[in-house]
């Protein structure tokens, strides 16, 4: 029970930090804040920024607690999704693809329904369509 409360508090804290980052207008400020969020909530930006989806899934598989793993995957998907707005092609599509794959995994394996997640997945499909792997 304590662990579940901790994970929920961590997610709320992450979402609040993400909201504050989105308020920033300057792209460089947003990128720097995104790097900080990676390092604070998910793991090293140096790894996750260049990792393939296969590498990400392997890294996440190392987290034994399923609820914690799904929460981290959801946070990482949010970071990829938001970071895509700060970069150009082809990096944008790569980030959106990784975000979609993570959202899809969380949707399939998690027990929390999220209309927001589904809307983001639909938006990603619209943006990159056939480029989804």
Describe these PLM feature segments.
Residues 1-73, 105, 127-133:
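N-terminal alpha-helical interaction modules that lie
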Residues 17, 77-80, 102-103, 124:
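Non-transmembrane amphipathic alpha-helical segments
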Residues 68-92:
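Mid-chain, well-packed structural core segment of small domains
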Residues 89-133:
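Amphipathic alpha-helical binding modules
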